[in-house]
Amino acid sequence: RRVEQYVEMVMVYLRLDSESTDFVIRTYDLDGIIRAAVRPFAGEFIGRRLQLHYEPLDYRAVTDEKWLGFVIGHVLSNALKYTSRGGITISMPEHGILSIRDTGMGIAPEDLPRIFERGYTGCNGRTDRRSSGIGLYLCRRVCDALGHTITARSAPGEGTEIRIGLRRRGLTIE
């Protein structure tokens, strides 16, 4: 699974740097995108006895289904990588804001402002050597291209929350 993720990240990187992308901007059911992103991790949730807290959000997002799915999938992958007990909560605390919150190890305050930089792994990534420093950078690039925002809140020992702002900024529906 890890090799597949690295290959996917390289392909995303190359596609984002090309002159044309394959964005299909439409109105999509966010719950369908979330379920498709969660599905590949079901075995890991079960095997590691981590809980997934998720209630359908009943939200329609103007986005690209495949690319937003990539972002959600990568955020889930990171959350699972750094969470040893407890679980992950997917919610919409404010209209148009998707939250993915974990009970993992959290991110050091000095690392938090840099986690979306290309190649930055931070203390956690350097310690366990399971980080390429490219995933969250790609998530930021995809969100920027889609007119979405992505931000992080975290505290060591308390977990991390990634928020994806889905309100439309400059997107035209096909």
Which ranges hold each PLM region?
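Conserved micro-motifs of the catalytic ATP-binding
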Residues: 18-23, 56, 60-63
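Short helix-loop "hinge" at the ATP-lid/N-box region of the Bergerat-fold HATPase_c
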Residues: 79-80
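Short beta-strand/loop element within the Bergerat-fold HATPase_c
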Residues: 87-97
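Acidic ATP/Mg2+-coordinating residue in the GHKL
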Residues: 102
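Short conserved segment of the HATPase_c
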Residues: 107-120
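Glycine-rich ATP-lid/hinge loop adjacent to the conserved G-boxes
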Residues: 120-130
